[in-house]
Each structure stands twice: as structure tokens, then as C-alpha cells.
Amino acid sequence: KSQDYIAAIAQFEQAARDPAYHLRAFGQIGLCYRALGLVPQAVAAFRKACMDYDAPRTQSLSVRYLLGRTLEQLGEKPEALEQYRLIFRTDRTFKDTAVRLSSLEGDQTREAGQPGTHSWRFGQAWKHVRQLLKGNS
């Protein structure tokens, strides 16, 4: 199975040479590295993908989200938080970014020795907004 991922990485690296496939190819390379347990290499691939500023917004947000999740996996919470903030500025409803953002901000607040009431209020407000959007008020 790992041989399949390694072969796929080589194919995606070739595809990444074409600017039209840069973001998607490096996104897939990152996923292959994650599947192989090579998390730092996955982060590097996702970062390369995020450098494609001409990519469609949804694809760009998806890869940035994967970068954030992978950084969280490595314990790089401040960097993950930065990625989620970039996503949130563009699309406040993208996946569970708001929840992750609130959670990581709360973690940072607690690590600084301050109560996390601001993050808790944000989380509660966001929960209420989601309920309103779903029509479950």
C-alpha cells in the first residue's frame, strides 16, 4: 500500500509542473504523505499548494484547511490557528473552521493563564447563528 502512495506522489509531482494542476497536485501529495505518516512532508506539500494564488477559492480553502488540520496533528497550534483565521476571513461557514478557531483561541487563552470566556461566548454565538441558518431556532 505504501508503494502505491509513493508512486502516486511521483505522478502528482509531474502533474504539479502544470500551473493548472499545481494546487490540486500538491494537495494530493500532502494527503499521500499524511497517509504514509510523514506529517512534516505533508505540511510542506500543503504549504506549496497554498502558494497557488490563482486557484479557485474553494479548492484553496480546502487545502488550507488540510494544512491547518495537519499542523494541529503536529501540535503546531499557533500556526494552525493562523490558517483557520485566513479561512474564516474568506468564508465564515467553511466546514468546522469557526469551531476549530474558537477551540484553538480558547486553548491559547488558557495557556496564557486567562479565562477563556471570550472564546466560549464566540462559540455560543456561532452555535446560535448556525441554528438560525438551519431554521432550528
What spans do the regions from the language model cover?
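Intrinsically disordered, low-complexity, charge-biased linker/tail regions
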Residues: K1-Y21, Q28-L31, A35-Y65, E72-S137
